[in-house]
């Protein structure tokens, strides 16, 4: 599937070039001409691997003979991508995740690497209910140990885990209507006409929760400046500042 190739390309760029994931993913989605559904899957895969990399590596260390750092980097990228689908994406059949990863191994590495990928991921399918789970919060939620220690000094263990878990959730897309460019009340209908979902934010005026649109740059209302992306936390900071 094209979405997996796009996601892998973005992961490779992030690793090799230190690329900003959001920027490179948008570039690759345009390059590969993904439709709305494929673009959404590519984003889920890319961000999912990046957000859960430490936990993915914890599991892979139980499946791979030898050290992960001895693997060809692109092979490790492919293993992470395949394992993420097996563990987090219920709608993706295990067989599809494994087979696509094997094909990526053949394309980006070599037949020997493809055989390793096949064995590791099939083993993951068999063992995922019996392997060891990470006990430390840094690994479980794939956050830097130093950050976890810092947060632990500011809050109790239950709040700490809740914050780390929330930080790993897929963020909502929030659009701020531009009242100088058009009527904010018309924004939901425009986005719904383009095939997306758009509802008023529950506690931020002129803000809307949007999903199912793929790349926002495809929306006419976005290109015309009728709305722009603004995270809810950023908007709250403005309100608090008066």
What are these regions (language model features)?
Residues 1-218:
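Class I Rossmann-like S-adenosyl-L-methionine
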Residues 210-242:
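SAM-dependent Rossmann-like transferase core, predominantly class I methyltransferases
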């Amino acid at each position: 599937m094209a979405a997996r190739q796009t996601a892998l390309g973005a992961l490779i760029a992030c690793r090799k070039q230190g690329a900003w994931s959001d920027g490179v993913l948008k570039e690759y989605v345009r390059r590969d001409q993904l439709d709305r559904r494929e673009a959404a899957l590519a984003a889920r895969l890319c961000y999912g691997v990046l957000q859960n990399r430490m936990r993915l590596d914890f599991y892979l260390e139980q499946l791979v003979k030898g050290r992960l750092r001895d693997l060809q980097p692109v092979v490790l990228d492919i293993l992470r991508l395949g394992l993420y689908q097996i563990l987090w994406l219920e709608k993706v059949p295990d067989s599809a995740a494994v087979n696509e990863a094997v094909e990526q191994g053949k394309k980006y590495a070599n037949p020997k690497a493809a055989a390793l990928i096949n064995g590791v991921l099939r083993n993951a399918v068999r063992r995922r209910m019996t392997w060891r789970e990470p006990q430390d919060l840094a690994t479980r939620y794939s956050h830097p140990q130093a950050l976890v220690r810092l947060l632990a000094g500011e809050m109790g263990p239950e709040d700490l885990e809740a914050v780390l878990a929330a930080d790993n959730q897929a963020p909502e897309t929030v659009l701020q209507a531009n009242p100088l460019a058009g009527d904010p009340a018309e924004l939901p209908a425009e986005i719904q006409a383009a095939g997306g979902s758009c509802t008023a934010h529950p506690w931020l005026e002129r803000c809307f929760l949007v999903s199912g649109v793929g790349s926002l740059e495809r929306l006419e209302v976005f290109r015309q400046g009728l709305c722009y992306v603004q995270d809810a936390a950023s908007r709250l900071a403005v309100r608090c500042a008066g």
